[in-house]
Amino acid sequence: MYDMINAKYLGKLIFLDFGQTITSLEETSDNSTFFIADEFGNFGSHYVGVVLEQVRSFNTVVILSYQSFANLRNIGGDNFKSQIINNTSTLIAHRLIDMMEAEEVANLYGVDITCASEIKSLKVGQALVRSISSYYGEIKDWLVQQIDKS
């Protein structure tokens, strides 16, 4: 229990420092800053949504990895989940076990609900990726598959 509480405080501290650092940089910097938070659901806090809103215009790439939307809801409910989804432009979905979760992802992809069964049946190493270009309104979809080198 205490480990989870400490993880939340540490996560908040890391994101607070990240947000302050990025917003202090030049907005027109040619260099991209990458920030990757694996297993975000274990240490994320509501403050991350605020940070995402602030750093979008600073040539920053933030990758949040989590197991399901339930992780986001546990942090801050449906509003927090919406805040995270609305402040990101790329969604990568690997195989989902839960059909309701797969349908929710299919809706985010803007595809028919029947795509949920395709998302649910992805093989190990496969992922669906959707990227939205806010400048041109383009939507690009890819099926990403890991290449087996054996």
From Swiss-Prot:
InterPro entries: P-loop_NTPase, T4SS_TraD_DNA-bd
Protein name: Uncharacterized protein MPN_513
Domain of life: Bacteria
Species assigned in the record: Mycoplasma pneumoniae (strain ATCC 29342 / M129 / Subtype 1)
